[in-house]
């Protein structure tokens, strides 16, 4: 056996997820009705901006048999009902973190009844009624971010001070200070908005056009580098998406993402970017948009809806979402993979069949792409360049 440690699995970048999603807090240390009420107050205040979810468990009296609802009692493993103003799924199967994260993939903020379930971060309520119960859950306090004092409580329990590093730096509010609690979560969510990376799609073979569209000089430099420079003011990092054989052509000014999902066109390029950095949002732009400018990108970023799976423009040509000038949020990664597993590799189909935010383009001509020599000549004329 080799001295080097054998690796059984690919070294994949994993998204920063908890048991249920990216941003989750377990509230524990007080009776369940108080946790439910607090969660309702937070959700009522923040649901206008964020998709919120609540996770709990039912209480069953000892010795009382579990009764399955509806058709589950007849042996069904699942039942779905369209409730007109909402949808209801009921399952008779075991769930673990993988299943929870799939069901709640759209959620931005998840509040968990920590008396029954665990979450990545915690809010600890100081309540004499649940002191003994809280002592038994010390191993669950892995990332305490807030203390809440119930009426009559004035200090943190001593056993918490011993168990939680730097406990004195954790904010402390009264459970009745609802505005402060809501502001705490609002600030946490604002800080959790994913950074934007830029991705220039330059890996196509340009079969219809006849030559590499990324190498056309529209603005004094090759188009793929021009677009990459346009993206820089709006992105933390900018990458050029390319095929393996194109790597040697890049001059080193920009990072690259080589397709690891091959033979899927732009769909594979987007997935390859998420595979590299799954917690980033990706501003994906095709390199065949010669009229694209800073104003269009600025409009897209300023109107970004980070709670959607993506923010895009409506195409002025066919009225459909334009997938190749789109901000794809991290939550879209799982959806893109899901569509692929069902036999679809069209990013536009994902946008059509999801909650994507679709904007009217401020300058419709900027979305004109060049796939043929006729479109090439039209673009040159619009740019005031010499035409043949």
Predicted regions: what is each one?
Residues 162-195, 368-388:
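Charged phosphate-binding loop/patch that engages nucleotide di/tri-phosphates or the phosphate backbone
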Residues 109-187:
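Phosphate/Mg2+-binding loops and adjacent switch elements
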Residues 1-26, 173-191:
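Extreme N-terminal, non-catalytic leader segments
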Residues 22, 49-50, 76, 104-109, ...:
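Short, high-confidence coil segments that cap the C-terminus of an alpha-helix
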Residues 4-8, 78-82, 149-150, 166-178, ...:
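Short acidic-hydrophobic, aromatic-tinged amphipathic segments that line or gate anion-handling sites
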Residues 34, 60-66, 131-134, 152-160, ...:
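Short, charged/polar "capping" segments at the starts of alpha-helices
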Residues 33-35, 45, 58, 193-344, ...:
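Nucleotide and nucleotide-moiety/phosphate-recognizing core
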Residues 14-24, 36-93, 98, 103:
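N-terminal phosphate/diphosphate-binding loop that engages ATP/GTP or pyrophosphate donors
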